[in-house]
Curated annotation (Swiss-Prot):
One of its GO terms (cellular component) is host cell cytoplasm. Keywords: Early protein, Host cytoplasm, Host nucleus, Host-virus interaction, Modulation of host cell apoptosis by virus. It comes from Murine adenovirus A serotype 1 (MAdV-1). Contains a PML interaction motif that allows the subnuclear PML localization. GO terms for biological process: symbiont-mediated perturbation of host apoptosis; symbiont-mediated perturbation of host ubiquitin-like protein modification. Plays a major role to prevent cellular inhibition of viral genome replication. Assembles an SCF-like E3 ubiquitin ligase complex based on the cellular proteins ELOB, ELOC, CUL5 and RBX1, in cooperation with viral E4orf6. This viral RING-type ligase ubiquitinates cellular substrates and targets them to proteasomal degradation: TP53/p53, LIG4, MRE11-RAD50-NBS1 (MRN) complex, ITGA3, DAXX and BLM. E1B-55K probably acts as the substrate-specific adapter of the SCF-like E3 ubiquitin ligase complex. This is E1B 55 kDa protein. It is found in: Host nucleus; Host cytoplasm. It comes from the Viruses. GO terms for molecular function: ubiquitin-like ligase-substrate adaptor activity. InterPro entries: Adeno_E1B_55kDa, Pectin_lyase_fold/virulence. Interacts with host PML-4 and PML-5; this interaction promotes efficient subnuclear targeting of E1B-55K to PML nuclear bodies. Interacts with E4-ORF3 protein. Interacts with E4-ORF6 protein. Belongs to the adenoviridae E1B 55 kDa protein family. The keyword Metal-binding does not apply.
């Protein structure tokens, strides 16, 4: 009884509403009787206006203490992001992982360069505001720099802090002497995400291997990827959302092995912009130029026993999925690969300039360029694979395979619509906004 009373008093000091739902015992307003007055009093208590803690008034450590004492009380209270005190972390103030576990809401100093030399494990909800601070990830960190996961009931759910969030952080790769870079690059992962995460306005510069590897719901918005081997690798039934990001000099920007929405991004001088293995949408993107031949790698992808050279926009063969939605994109000086799927593949209001599109044989009647803005387009159909000409290439699965070069025939006149027969003054080519 004394412990419960102490807990209620501590909750009142923090500003949490304390409700006695037992109908008896001692609450904040005295004793309740069993004649029904307790139920009436409870109804009045629930409907009255609750006084919430003011801005920046509660430390995350205090919230954890109360949560561990009585986790059920958090179902009866409203706790928001702005009420949590932020902790200003400066270099040399302790281990970052321990600080995240203790404080949750952390603000970095933009005038300090932070260094990550040991693997970091994030196992609770957190919100990290970088304010443009640079975090250098050293090669000595090993094959996995940051592992994000959440243990059950280790932290409460706070409105506005429902995910692991990184805001305005700049992650830079730093080589270390004595580290086998080639071996590390094949297996390196900057972020291994197994809990819902958000990256907002972050920079990633020069990372080998996988920059963001996710097996859960992931949102990447307003971020920049520069000289990264693979920007985003998503493999889960949960959705991936990549919005308003910029990719420059990356080998592979987005590999979506699950539902994905790729919206209003820009990619320049990248070998592959997106690999779509499941359904999704690619809307409002601008993809210009591939990597120059001197810097490009011979990349390929294997799927269901088929092996193809990797293209800038690669729609993987998948008989159980429909084609992704492509609309309002600008593709210039790139190539595309369209595999066999269900339904039809339309390039609605897409600008195709100096584009080479390679179609698998079965997918030829399923592709339509009727609603596209065709500047310079070459369409080729794969007829067979030549056994006389082959090359060993690096596959996206991590191994190396011998790729047989496809033999193609150009079918551009048969798939490009005859504009003398079809007018452009139609709804499919008009602006619907």
């Amino acid at each position: 009884m004394e412990d419960r009373q102490a807990l209620e008093e501590a909750g009142e000091e923090m500003g949490f509403p304390v409700v006695n739902i037992s109908g008896g015992g001692r609450g904040r307003r005295g004793n309740y009787s069993n004649d029904g007055s307790g139920a009436r009093e409870l109804s009045l208590r629930v409907n009255e206006e609750v006084t919430e803690p003011p801005y920046n008034s509660i430390t995350y450590a205090e919230v954890l203490r109360l949560y561990r004492q009585n986790g059920f009380s958090f179902f009866l209270s409203n706790l928001h992001f702005e009420q949590i005190k932020y902790f200003e972390h400066r270099e040399g103030e302790g281990d970052l992982g321990a600080i995240i576990r203790e404080h949750g809401k952390i603000v970095l100093d933009p005038n300090v360069v932070y260094h990550l030399r040991r693997p970091l494990k994030i196992q609770s909800l957190c919100y990290i505001v970088g304010r443009g601070a640079v975090i250098k990830v050293h090669a000595s960190v090993g094959q996995q720099a940051v592992h994000v996961y959440r243990q059950l009931d280790i932290s409460p759910r706070i409105m506005g802090m429902l995910n692991v969030t990184f805001l305005e952080c700049k992650f830079h790769w730093a080589d270390d002497e004595g580290v086998n870079f080639e071996r590390l690059a094949r297996h390196f992962t900057l972020f291994f995400l197994t809990y819902e995460s958000v990256f907002f306005a972050c920079d990633f510069v020069g990372f080998p291997g996988l920059t963001l590897r996710s097996t859960c719901l992931l949102r990447v918005e307003g971020c920049t990827f520069t000289s990264c081997a693979v920007g985003i690798h998503h493999a889960d039934v949960a959705d991936l959302k990549v919005k308003a990001c910029y990719f420059n000099h990356c080998s592979v920007c987005i590999f979506a092995d699950g539902p994905a929405d790729v919206l209003r991004n820009c990619a320049t001088n990248c070998d592959c912009f997106v690999i779509m293995e499941q359904e999704g949408s690619v809307v409002g993107n601008s993809v210009v130029y591939k990597l120059p031949p001197s810097r490009a790698d011979d990349l390929m992808i294997c799927q269901q026993g088929y092996m193809y050279p990797l293209s800038s926009i690669h729609i993987v063969r998948n008989l159980s999925c429909e084609y992704p939605k492509l609309k309002n994109n600008v593709f210039s000086h790139v190539d595309m690969h369209v595999g066999l799927r269900q339904g039809l593949q339309h390039f609605n209001q897409c600008n195709l300039s100096f584009v080479y599109c390679m179609l698998e044989t079965e997918s030829v009647p399923k592709v339509s360029f009727y609603s596209s803005y065709i500047q310079t387009l070459t369409v080729a159909q794969i007829v067979q694979f030549s056994r006389e000409h082959s090359r060993e290439c690096q596959c996206f699965c991590g191994g190396r395979h011998r790729l047989l070069f496809p033999s193609v025939v150009h079918i551009t006149p048969t798939v490009v619509p005859d504009r003398t027969r079809f007018t452009v003054d139609v709804e499919e080519l008009s602006d619907d906004e």
